[in-house]
From Swiss-Prot:
Name this polypeptide is given: Phosphoribosylformylglycinamidine cyclo-ligase
Catalytic reaction list: 2-formamido-N(1)-(5-O-phospho-beta-D-ribosyl)acetamidine + ATP = 5-amino-1-(5-phospho-beta-D-ribosyl)imidazole + ADP + phosphate + H(+)
Pathway: Purine metabolism; IMP biosynthesis via de novo pathway; 5-amino-1-(5-phospho-D-ribosyl)imidazole from N(2)-formyl-N(1)-(5-phospho-D-ribosyl)glycinamide: step 2/2
Gene Ontology cellular-component annotations: cytosol
Gene from which the chain derives: purM
EC number: 6.3.3.1
Organism: Xanthomonas campestris pv. campestris (strain B100)
UniProt xrefs under InterPro entries: PurM-like_C_dom, PurM-like_C_sf, PurM-like_N, PurM-like_N_sf, PurM_cligase
Annotated localization: Cytoplasm
Keyword terms of this UniProt record: ATP-binding, Cytoplasm, Ligase, Nucleotide-binding, Purine biosynthesis
CDD domains named in the record: PurM (cd02196)
Amino acid sequence: MTYRDAGVDIDAGNALVERIKPLVKRSFRPEVMGGLGGFGALFDLSGKYKEPVLVSGTDGVGTKLKLAQQLGRHDTIGIDLVGMCVNDVLVQGAEPLFFLDYFATGKLDIDTAAAVVGGIARGCELSGCALIGGETAEMPDMYPPGEYDLAGFTVGAVEKSQLLDGAQVREGDVLIGIASSGPHSNGYSLIRKIYERAGAPADLVLDDGVALIDALMAPTALYVKPILALLKSHGEAIHAMAHVTGGGLTENIIRVIPDGLGLDIDATAWILPPVFAWLQREGAVADAEMWRTFNCGIGFVLVAAPAQAAALEQALDAQSLAHWRIGQVVTAQGDERVRIG
């Protein structure tokens, strides 16, 4: 009896590595030492930072993965995986340096795995982050046929003096919301239930002319390069940042706001994108549930000094990033620290 007889095909794993090597190498940075296949991946941090603080992050894509598998759309879910991780470390002002992925399945399908890892490599390339390693685990009997799971891990760095931890946030600071590309990778357990119960036709088109399926599967926006450029040119104006993920607008921005302060968010400052309007209508989802489940069109938030907010907005315009002033920092009123109205 062989390992292949037991359900693990080492040759398929090796073939996958050869297939993805060119894609992975396109994401490499000069600091990457060596190639693929070592027991550990190497990254040279010397020379670039005076007092580097390493910032780590790990995440998955939730049950958006189920929808991707249901629809056979494997080429962009890897971008989602990268976005969920690198956008998180970006919040503290860190530049993502390198990324590792974990792909697990019951039986390895080389084409599917290559499409997924290709998306991861593309996401890393778009974020200036090197895909320096990963693990492909073929585990018979652990997953149903055709299913796989994903996890991502990233490490970034920021100068200690430039670390953003929310300590500078003051009452009166302005909230500048930057547009999301869609639901990103959060709320998909609810999204899938609404989608199934609505019985929407496969070719349903939303009010903005985008097919519903395309809107639901739009890759998570990658904010790294434009925000790092903004930090370099207008860093003194940014007191904190937030990545709007699980918990939506209600629970994410407040994570970077000091005790004693709260948020007053103006829900009329931007128009709810059609994909979220469809979800709310078809699912009969209450406003409060929308705010704490989805990003509702705001994927990333800058907490800015009011006197410099206009300059930040001009810089965002120059980078063609859609944005709105969505509220301000206020004194907290009792236990209610976030008001959306």
